[in-house]
């Protein structure tokens, strides 16, 4: 009987990708099969996020909930950014944890588990062996028509509030050919849509073979678009400072590049952007969006926003609201500022009451939600090209797909359509989803 692993993932799409790789590594090296039921697991792994304090504390709360499973010999491991940041402290705080590993050492999981069994004590490896992990990962195994592909690791921007450079290391790009080989392998398995991943994905600079030449992100997109079977290309997360003219021009040449972009601006006040060390102004950000929409008028934009950064006045907040109005974002990930230990922003004086921050967050989210509704209403009556992903989560008798602009559409249809690209006429707009009907071509 095969051993089973339960992996709980916190945070970003990079972590989702890493969790899939953990399952692949353990399956190839030790025969583990994935399970969605922790009660059936022989190994429980937490792939953690430390971007916000609440996410970090939730990890320790959840660890306590699974502690009782140790009575039947279950192994528990903590990976991801909290592991990288806390290291041995996790063992001190939760001594029943067996292995602690960082984002760059997940490929060493089998070795760590073997060492735990041999030495009868917890094992910790939170080193930064740069790109080594990709050389030790088994070929990707996928189910479905879309897949993530990590093209680089880490970030070298050192924004004043962010722990990523400390938990995932500096930017390191995968070799150009390695990325193309992985994408081609996914296409051979039936994948039609790839999402290229990185903490700062558009800073990609990959080595080309044995030459001294370096491929930038725009060139990588061009080559990925030429791989047979790949019909859509997405990427996340990008940085405004790395949005080069070559990358903007790629939207004119590469129809497989979707008209949806997550480009975190974080704030709309130049004073706050400077304190965040973002390296651009609100006007420069809006200029990038104008250039993109001159090429793709239908470009859907989403962003991250931090409300209540130290020193934020009501005037600063209103500048952020003006930027939201000007850009017309149709989705966002917005949070109240959470000071992270070890970052410069954690030492900044913060005299804004929490209730003021909460009011501002609610006001921002209300505007974004109104944008979502208005843009969804505009889609009614249009025909949208969907990649059918599977059964609808709302109604298991229906199907769901995703538009190029990243909107979920639920519709009645035959399960044989799963994995296919089809046209659907939008018949109704709901709060965060659309409804439609398949367009029959005669």
From Swiss-Prot:
Keywords assigned by UniProt, alphabetized: 4Fe-4S, Cytoplasm, Iron, Iron-sulfur, Metal-binding, S-adenosyl-L-methionine, Transferase, tRNA processing
Residues where [4Fe-4S] cluster 1 binds: 12, 49, 81
Coiled coil start-end: none
One Gene Ontology CC term in the entry: cytosol
MTTase N-terminal domain boundaries: 3-118
Binding site for [4Fe-4S] cluster 2: 155, 159, 162
Names of required cofactors: [4Fe-4S] cluster
InterPro entries linked to this entry: Elp3/MiaA/NifB-like_rSAM (IPR006638), Methylthiotransferase (IPR005839), Methylthiotransferase_CS (IPR020612), Methylthiotransferase_N (IPR013848), Methylthiotransferase_N_sf (IPR038135), MiaB_methiolase (IPR006463), rSAM (IPR007197), rSAM_horseshoe (IPR023404)
Pfam hit, one: Radical_SAM
EC number: 2.8.4.3
GO molecular function, one term: N6-isopentenyladenosine methylthiotransferase activity
Gene3D superfamilies: Methylthiotransferase, N-terminal domain, tm_1862 like domain
Family membership: Belongs to the methylthiotransferase family. MiaB subfamily.
Task performed by this protein: Catalyzes the methylthiolation of N6-(dimethylallyl)adenosine (i(6)A), leading to the formation of 2-methylthio-N6-(dimethylallyl)adenosine (ms(2)i(6)A) at position 37 in tRNAs that read codons beginning with uridine.
Assembly and oligomerization: Monomer.
Protein name: tRNA-2-methylthio-N(6)-dimethylallyladenosine synthase
Organism: Delftia acidovorans (strain DSM 14801 / SPH-1)
Gene this chain is encoded by: miaB
């Amino acid at each position: 009987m095969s051993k089973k692993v339960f992996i709980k993932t916190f945070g970003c799409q990079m972590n989702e990708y890493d969790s899939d790789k953990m399952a692949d590594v353990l399956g190839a090296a030790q025969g583990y099969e994935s399970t969605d039921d922790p009660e059936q697991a022989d190994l429980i792994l937490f792939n953690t996020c430390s971007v916000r304090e609440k996410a970090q504390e939730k990890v320790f709360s959840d660890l306590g909930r699974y502690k009782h499973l140790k009575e039947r010999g279950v192994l528990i491991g903590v990976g991801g950014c909290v592991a990288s940041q806390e290291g041995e402290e996790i063992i001190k705080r939760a001594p029943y944890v067996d292995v602690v590993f960082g984002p760059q050492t997940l490929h060493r999981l089998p070795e760590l588990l073997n060492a735990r069994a041999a030495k009868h004590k917890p094992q910790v490896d939170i080193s930064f062996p740069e790109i080594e992990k990709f050389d030790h990962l088994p070929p990707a195994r996928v189910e479905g028509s879309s897949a993530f592909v990590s093209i680089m690791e880490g970030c070298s921007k050192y924004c004043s509030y962010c722990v990523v450079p400390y938990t995932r290391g500096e930017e390191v790009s995968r070799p150009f050919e390695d990325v193309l080989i992985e994408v081609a392998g996914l296409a051979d398995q039936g994948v039609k849509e790839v999402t290229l991943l990185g903490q700062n994905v558009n800073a990609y600079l990959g080595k080309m073979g044995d030459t001294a030449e370096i491929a930038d992100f725009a060139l990588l997109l061009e080559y990925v678009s030429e791989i047979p079977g790949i019909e859509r290309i997405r990427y996340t997360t990008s940085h405004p400072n790395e949005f080069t003219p070559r990358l903007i021009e790629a939207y004119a040449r590469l129809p497989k590049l979707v008209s949806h972009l997550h480009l975190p601006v974080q704030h709309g006040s130049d004073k706050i952007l400077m304190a965040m060390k973002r390296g651009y102004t609100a006007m420069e950000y809006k200029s990038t969006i104008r250039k993109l929409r001159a090429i793709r008028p239908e470009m859907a934009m989403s962003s991250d926003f931090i409300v209540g950064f130290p020193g934020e006045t009501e005037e600063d907040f209103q500048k952020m609201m003006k930027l939201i109005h000007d850009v017309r974002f149709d989705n966002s990930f917005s949070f109240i500022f959470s000071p992270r230990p070890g970052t410069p922003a954690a030492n900044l004086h913060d005299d804004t009451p929490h209730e003021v921050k909460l009011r501002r967050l609610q006001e921002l989210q209300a505007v974004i939600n109104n944008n979502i509704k208005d843009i969804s209403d505009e889609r009614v009556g249009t025909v949208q090209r969907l990649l059918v992903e599977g059964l609808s989560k709302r109604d298991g008798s229906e199907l769901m797909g995703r538009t190029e602009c990243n909107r979920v559409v639920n519709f009645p249809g035959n399960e044989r359509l799963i994995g296919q690209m089809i046209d659907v006429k939008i018949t109704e707009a709901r709060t965060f989803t659309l409804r439609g009907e398949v367009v029959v071509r005669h």
